[in-house]
Amino acid sequence: MPGPDRRTLLRRALRGTGGLLAAGLLPGAGGILPAAAQTRFSPEANILFFTIATGPPGGTNFPIGVALATAVSSPPGTPPCDEGGACGVPNLVATAMTTAGSVVNVKGVVSGIFNSGMAQADVIFRAYHGAGFDFEGAPLTDLRVVANLFPQFVHVVVRADSNLKTIADLRDRRIAVEALGSGTRRDAELILAAYGVRPSPDRILALDQGDLGSLLAEQRVDALILIAGIPVPTVMNLAERQTIRFLAIDGPEARGLATQHRFFATDTIPGGTYPGQNPVRTLSVGAQWVVSARAPEEQIFLLTQALWNPANRNLLTSGHASGQFVRLRTALRGIAIPLHPGAERYYREAGLLPS
């Protein structure tokens, strides 16, 4: 009879901690704690509690963050990795925290509210350099990257019955993007400008992602631009209700954007991601794991080592479809600010950086 899997062993070990933070470790659970309730270290139990700020419960980052928290945790009482137990950092218990998203996460990491966070590479870049959003003139220079995790694909969606064939065709059209502060609007403006499209402010609608699909379905806008891990629920719902098409981001314009802005990468939305959809050439922005420069080097080295332990692969791929993209070979892709020294040490030892 097969023994319990790693997730079951972690659940049992957490009972010995009074269940504290267990919700953040188990997929599908809430993982929500007020900042004041976060415990960094429990001397009595010899446990280090470690928070990972993710995103809204219905998004991609939260389930990936829960899987990440499970992978790097190894509570007291858990069997060692080579005996089928936890392959995380000894005596560390990580929890995934639901948040509003990237901007909140990078601010929270630098201010010490969170031990770490997940954020889009473009938001990380702008935060570090103090350019755009709430970061203008106030750079978060203490921000450091641990790893690039998975791509968040740029989706440009139109109705199948429209006459829009290329990004350049969006000139003078009504376009809906995610709300201001998400990073999507600024990226959308960069992409549109590369194709000679500079819409006036009244032609771009910024709304919560959940509201975007109805605008296109009701023909109140001509196109949607979203950046997210795949599949995107809003796009999936649209594709199941009506026929849609995707506009490619390709050619010299796409290559120029990826060259000029290090957080962009040329990419492809795989065929079959959405009903009846062929492969789509596009750009992607990495979802990356960040910490403060003040985090101890040895701790971040061990966290990076646990993240890329081959024994944790199934944990990372089971939480969400985007988990399939969390791979060591793309760990340094699209990183545009300094690595944390602990992470840098790991990648040098792993041969991904020159020694």
Label the model's feature ranges:
Residues 49-84, 148-218, 313, 318, ...:
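Bilobed "Venus flytrap"/periplasmic-binding protein-like clamshell domains
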Residues 96, 101-146:
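N-terminal segment of the mature folded domain
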Residues 1-24:
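N-terminal secretory signal peptides and thylakoid transit peptides that target proteins
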Residues 40-118:
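N-terminal (or domain-start) structured segment
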Residues 136-149, 154, 272-281:
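A structural signal for short loop-to-beta-strand junctions that line the ligand-binding cleft
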Residues 3, 25-46:
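C-terminal segment of N-terminal export signals and the immediately downstream linker at the start
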Residues 121-123, 131-132, 162, 198-290, ...:
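Pocket-lining segment of extracytoplasmic ligand-binding domains
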Residues 207, 211, 228-239, 246, ...:
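An extracytoplasmic/periplasmic, membrane-proximal ligand-sensing/linker region
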